[in-house]
Amino acid sequence: MADTIAQFEHVISICRDLFVKKLKDYGASWRIMRPQSVTDQIFIKAKRIRSIETKGESKIDEGVRSELIGIVNYGIIGLIQLHLGYSDSEDITVERALDLYDKYMTETKELMYAKNHDYDEAWRSMRISSYTDLILTKICRTKQIENNNGKTLVSEGVDANYICLLYTSPSPRDGATSRMPSSA
């Protein structure tokens, strides 16, 4: 389990590093996005991953790695947007955005480590393509919950699905780690 934690921390640092760089380039321009738009951005990235897996090639010089990082970072953005609501302007500082990023990533990590313990790292035996299918399933669920104005009868809400997308996306499993860049 210690190796798993170190591997997850490495992947998380890659995602955060890119988030920081894009935050410096673009500011918190994503603050104008409504949660439904964030969900659609994640959907686009997951569909591209499935397309690359199915076709076995990509015509754009960005592979699966960048899409997985995007899913993680948009998942965090989604959690921030659910917490703060969307805005008509970039209404938070870089520091505040990073504080919120770290807060939601920490909450997600704690849940991920608990689930990893309970499931005894069963995810390490999963096929890579199953991750993509799980991500797409979570997105479909999220869209349905959004279409129902966030109301569910027995299921968790949009926030729980965003969190699940975060720990389903880039895993340190052999083969999956190679999908992540060694540097951002």
Language model features with spans:
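Hydrophobic alpha-helical segments, chiefly the membrane-spanning helices
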Residues: 180-184
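Conserved small/polar residues in nucleotide/adenosyl-binding loops
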Residues: 167-174
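Short conserved catalytic/interaction loops centered on acidic-Pro-aromatic/His motifs
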Residues: 81-90, 147-158, 173
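Intrinsic disorder/low-complexity detector
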Residues: 1-33, 82-128
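Short, contiguous, well-structured surface segments enriched in hydrophobic/aromatic residues
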Residues: 16-60, 64, 123-154, 158
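Hydrophobic, ordered structural segments
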Residues: 63-84
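Charged, amphipathic alpha-helical oligomerization/scaffolding segments
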Residues: 14, 41, 70, 100-103, ...
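Short, compact, well-ordered microdomains
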Residues: 62, 66-69, 160-161, 166
